[in-house]
From Swiss-Prot:
It is an enzyme of class 2 (transferase). This is Mycothiol acetyltransferase. One of its GO terms (biological process) is mycothiol biosynthetic process. Belongs to the acetyltransferase family. MshD subfamily.
Length: 296
């Protein structure tokens, strides 16, 4: 039985988390992003659940943007199917339902763009409309940090920094379907994550004006020993050209290395050539690519 569920009960939440772990173990990559895990306990997403008896055989998360969302926002779906329930048409049926429910422009993420996902997309007549690279590098032999005299860098101090952080984030990512248009609630959700460390959120200010110019939010993967992440690097468009992206990224890398981590990863849009060049100069290389499929 497959049905849309407005609110997941504790049993289903637990089974879905176990299903995600099982699929990750089978495929070598997580089938859904961290946002899906946050939304399991809320009402911000639509939940499509396929059950085999009392067990969850597949789960689809669908986020439909509201009227206040970025104009670039589209409905986004993420799907996980139990390894034992695959090749039975469950996944394709659920994707069809998501495309109908989400409306025109709906996209479905395929993490790692695995052959099975490519085959399903071909079957449904979908094409890759967006690609997101995961890049990695070792945290050894980092370049030295050189801070321009016109800039100061410090870590996050508390709620007094929130309005400036939102301002820069939403200016830097005004074009981005997920990262743009953040509210105080979006910050609060991430501050509530077990991995959040205020000492790992770095803010760059102009020395003369004290204005926030950019930030780098780092993340330590608690479930992957030795792994860190360049979670978000955002620079105010008005401050572009001052080398802040390079500086902030490097400050965060040194912080992660100081925690004893061995490897760092980040995600970047495949068509963001400026960011790609910055990260390549810092020694990052593409490790895998996620694809968002939809109708052309």
């Amino acid at each position: 039985m497959t049905e849309w569920v407005p609110l997941l009960d504790n049993r289903r939440q637990l089974q879905i988390r176990e299903l995600i772990v099982e699929a990750t173990r089978a495929d070598g990559i997580a089938p859904v992003g961290e946002q899906v895990l946050r939304e399991l306990r809320g009402t911000g997403a639509k939940h499509l659940v396929a059950e085999d008896g009392d067990d969850v055989a597949a789960f689809l998360n669908l986020v439909v943007p509201d009227e206040a969302a970025s104009e670039n926002a589209t409905a986004m779906a993420e799907l996980v199917v139990a390894p034992a329930a695959r090749r039975r048409g469950i996944g394709s049926a659920m994707v069809r339902e998501a495309l109908a429910e989400g409306g025109a422009g709906t996209r479905v993420w395929a993490h790692g763009d695995l052959p099975a996902a490519q085959s399903l997309a071909t079957k449904l007549g979908l094409v890759a409309l967006r690609r997101l690279h995961q890049m990695r590098r070792a945290l050894a032999d980092l370049p030295a940090i050189r801070v321009d005299a016109s800039v100061t860098v410090r870590h996050y101090l508390g709620p007094q920094d929130d309005s400036d952080l939102l301002r820069v984030n939403n200016a830097a990512f005004s074009w981005h379907p997920e990262q743009g248009g953040w509210t105080p609630g979006d910050l609060a959700d991430r501050f509530a994550e077990p991995w959040f460390d205020p000492r790992g959120l770095f803010l760059a200010h102009d020395v003369q004006t004290a204005k926030l110019l950019g930030f780098h939010w780092t993340k330590r993967h608690l479930d992957k020993p030795g792994m860190g992440e360049v979670y978000i690097v955002g620079v105010d468009p008005a401050a572009q050209g001052r080398g802040l992206g390079h500086l902030l990224t490097l400050v965060g890398l040194h912080h992660l290395a100081g925690l004893g981590l061995e490897t760092v990863l980040l995600y970047v849009e495949s068509d963001n050539q400026a960011a790609l060049r910055t990260y390549e100069r810092l020694g990052f290389a593409v490790a895998l690519t996620d694809a968002a499929y939809g109708r052309a």
